[in-house]
């Protein structure tokens, strides 16, 4: 998106929540300059935002699918989510076979096609783990966490993880 006025334009490439309700906007000044107390207009690039939502949500389905196909030892080691692609880094002891890749793809696509609502709840980290949420060990969590649940599977969620990111409202919105 952009932050701009008649004398200034800033192209936003990333937004991150910092302390409380403080959000940091990262990007580049495209023209002009800005002074303290200047009025500005904020515009969201909705297509980019929707793409990032879809890819970010897909990482959760991919993670759980990998765990179901390859084993529960699989853990996320990192990811890159952009408006045109995603990369998902994970632990596993050996190369993945073509058959395993097909099974993972099948799991992800079947959950997307079920058109399940994506649910978020706020709870304590202890409650989240008791409710089956997958937490990344080594991460520090506050008194409350956001729990994301996706893909209703016969009364159970396909994926439940702690996550504060932006997500689709329904798995079908992934694409």
Per-range role (PLM):
Residues 1-175:
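A glycine- and charged-residue-rich anion-binding loop/surface
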């Amino acid at each position: 998106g952009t932050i701009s006025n008649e004398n200034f334009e800033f192209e936003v490439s990333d937004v991150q929540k910092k302390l409380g309700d403080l959000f940091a906007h990262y990007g580049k000044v495209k023209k002009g300059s800005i002074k303290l107390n200047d009025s500005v207009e904020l515009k969201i690039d909705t297509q980019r935002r929707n793409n990032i939502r879809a890819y970010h949500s897909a990482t959760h389905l991919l993670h759980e699918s990998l765990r179901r196909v390859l084993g529960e030892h699989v853990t996320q080691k990192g990811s890159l989510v952009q408006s045109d692609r995603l990369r998902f880094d994970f632990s596993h002891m050996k190369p993945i076979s073509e058959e395993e890749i097909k099974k993972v793809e099948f799991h992800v696509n079947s959950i997307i096609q079920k058109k399940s609502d994506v649910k978020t709840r706020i709870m304590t980290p202890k409650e989240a783990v008791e409710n089956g949420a997958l937490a990344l060990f080594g991460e520090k969590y506050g008194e409350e966490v956001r729990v994301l649940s996706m893909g209703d599977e016969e009364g159970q969620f396909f994926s439940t993880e702690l996550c504060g990111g932006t997500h689709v409202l329904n798995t079908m919105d992934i694409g």
